[in-house]
Curated annotation (Swiss-Prot):
Region (PAI subdomain): 7-63
The protein's name in its UniProt record: Paired box protein Pax-9
Keywords from the named record: Developmental protein, DNA-binding, Nucleus, Paired box, Transcription, Transcription regulation
Encoding gene per record: Pax9
InterPro entries named in the record: Homeodomain-like_sf, PAIRED_DNA-bd_dom, Paired_dom, PAX_fam, WH-like_DNA-bd_sf
Record's keyword annotation contains Cytoplasm: no
Amino acid sequence: MEPAFGEVNQLGGVFVNGRPLPNAIRLRIVELAQLGIRPCDISRQLRVSHGCVSKILARYNETGSILPGAIGGSKPRVTTPTVVKHIRTYKQRDPGIFAWEIRDRLLADGVCDKYNVPSVSSISRILRNKIGNLAQQGHYDSYKQHQPAPQPALPYNHIYSYPSPITAAAAKVPTPPGVPAIPGSVALPRTWPSSHSVTDILGIRSITDQGVSDSSPYHSPKVEEWSSLGRNNFPAAAPHAVNGLEKGALEQEAKYGQAPNGLPAVSSFVSASSMAPYPTPAQVSPYMTYSAAPSGYVAGHGWQHAGSTPLSPHNCDIPASLAFKGMQAAREGSHSVTASAL
């Protein structure tokens, strides 16, 4: 008849997964082991897995008990206040001590035994969370005691510490008798200027500075005075000077100056009325007829030789007859316009 619950292992024994072995079987395993029977033989005889037999015997040799561990129970608390106190003492005596050294000292001093001594990770967590904060608080308190009193805040802008011109002027210029002095704490904070404004580029004071400086007996440049500094107030040049230079010196240099060969002198120039207008280039019609061969056409300059014709500017005859009717008409039209303009 098959059992109502449980499973059958490889040896034919019945076990319930997740449940401890009955105490009677546990006691029998220990008795057979004390008789000198090997664990593998005990496993075959009692039909219990070899791992279960080895685990029960190891726990009995370590603790002397055959009872199973707490099912679903929590591990007993090992970081008691007494242990934490001793760990703090060790850390204060030797700040560079390691967690494994603290664990060895707890065992050596008899604070803990091998069953309830905290692990290295637990000691590190205690040092980081509990003792570390206390050590930092103690260092902060000692630093705060030696720290001098904070200086009073300056009456400047809290964002940009820009010096106040009124305070600086009051520190340099003595106050004349009979005039009440402006205290430094009453000085208005100067706003942060814009680096692209005309006022800052020209160095003109702001409206706030002007309002305060109007009450002082000393003269300060106003905005109106800057407008008077125009070009019309500068002394005009003398009539006998050209561009700020003496006219006589220029004439003397022009008189003795010699120009290169083939070019007119500097002082001698031709009036505009006696010069002919520069001939405009002729507009060539895009539909002009061209009857000559490509090799017969010679490109010439705008100027013409004395003995040349319009069709042969280099005084050479073109064998083929060219029909430049559009060009000739445009050239005649430009000459007529030039003559009428003169």
